[in-house]
């Protein structure tokens, strides 16, 4: 088998419609667009959500909520992810270096998900009650 002999399986690819190539093709003249009207024109058609002039659903429903800007720079970290990181002291920079969190993250909270079997020191991270208990049970400590 060579790259130049590869071809798709028989019947897996349909030939593209060749529009405007004579009456006999079935797609000549109007090219499957019918006669006149907005959808037959070049660039014709209505935008997404358009309901023929009726007040569209996205305008009938009220606005609600907002996107918290703090949520964009905050991350949740699982205890199982902490267990995989080398080193005894773990802070925000160590998490970024290990690609556990993105470079734009400014705050992180460690949650109880998974388990940890070695003593680690968390520095400058928020910690949930369950995660705090698990870290201290493993002999680790949390520094503010």
Curated annotation (Swiss-Prot):
GO molecular function, one term: structural constituent of ribosome
Region (Disordered): 1-53
Domain of life according to the entry: Bacteria
Quaternary structure and interacting proteins, as annotated: Part of the 50S ribosomal subunit.
Family from the record: Belongs to the universal ribosomal protein uL15 family.
Stated role: Binds to the 23S rRNA.
Name assigned to this protein: Large ribosomal subunit protein uL15
Species of provenance: Edwardsiella ictaluri (strain 93-146)
Source species taxonomy: Bacteria, Pseudomonadati, Pseudomonadota, Gammaproteobacteria, Enterobacterales
